[in-house]
Amino acid sequence: MLKLRLKRNGRKRQPAYRLVIMESTTRRNGRPVDEVGYYNPITKESYFNKEKIVKWLSYGVQPTETVFQLLKKSNLIEI
């Protein structure tokens, strides 16, 4: 099952995350199927490629809870 989740990068105590499509059994920093954005929790900077995210969600990809909250906050997902 494919998941829309965060992949950590950055230095120690300075996290930055990429928003990626991965198999649910892949380790956190494994090879993604596709990269669809990034999020920096320190500066609150984020970028989400709306076209790619909508495309993957239409294919049935499930976002994790954290990613779901980020997408909801940026008005990409409506409930």
From Swiss-Prot:
Similarity field: Belongs to the bacterial ribosomal protein bS16 family.
Cite a GO CC annotation: small ribosomal subunit
Give TM regions: none
| InterPro entries referenced in this protein's UniProt entry, alphabetically | Ribosomal_bS16 (IPR000307), Ribosomal_bS16_CS (IPR020592), Ribosomal_bS16_dom_sf (IPR023803)
Recite the UniProt keywords alphabetically. Answer: Chloroplast, Plastid, Ribonucleoprotein, Ribosomal protein
Query: Which Pfam families does the protein's record reference?
Result: Ribosomal_S16
What is the protein's given name? Small ribosomal subunit protein bS16c
Q: What organism is listed for this UniProt entry?
A: Thalassiosira pseudonana (Marine diatom)
Q: Cite the source lineage.
A: Eukaryota, Sar, Stramenopiles, Ochrophyta, Bacillariophyta
